[in-house]
């Protein structure tokens, strides 16, 4: 039952990552299309669940953004409730992590309400984006932990009694085919974590620039250009961090080979982000699709980097955990040869 339930929650967490990335992108599209106040009330839109007569592109974006947020909230509630009710069959970290994500979803909903009722204040909109990106990373980590083969607490005693591997802190043991004899290089999780922090900071800086409408003001009136310059300056270390991680992973043997598909994807996303960022500036933000694609790339990049960081630390934890004690070797017995007297006297 435990493994089946865990596989179901793993699938649910994967769908939640996709839904959260879509939520970030739709929220960005809502801002780009200036549709943040297309629905003047909250949580309904024009007093109904589906505003048929008022429906246009802007209303649809805001309405669909709220619908996606509602779906994410329901999915997170199912994950957290199942983790608590079935905690004896699941890893002990899952109720805490899923509960924290559920609290963040509730906080995110409150921020969404404030963005409408307070008429889009920049600080609230930025906090709304920051919470969404944090949720993307946390749920991505949750999915990786579930995928890694976390075993229920009840399975710990049989594993120990049968001479199996003892479970390190956090309720994890290397599962079959998990490459338990290989581990991440010591530098790998640190570099992945640094790249994640740099990209997260760059994404927040981009969100601050967007909520201040700094790029538009810089192009039209020559004001607010400091935000634009800061965003361009911070893009360099973020891009170099991801590309360095991808290059070192490509040339490193062992465990790193399994991470090459994701690190290569992250590197391609960074290259695409550079192209989209340059294009949006050259087009002076006149093509909404380019800006929205830029936000999609940032959300996907954060989800992948969070997953890679989790994999790195998890691999280190699994191989550095307490090792099972082997049984002492039997003491060889000394066989004494019979003395001549014993031979004579029988």
PLM region spans:
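Polytopic transmembrane helical bundles with strong interfacial aromatic enrichment
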Residues: 1-161, 166-168, 172, 177-346
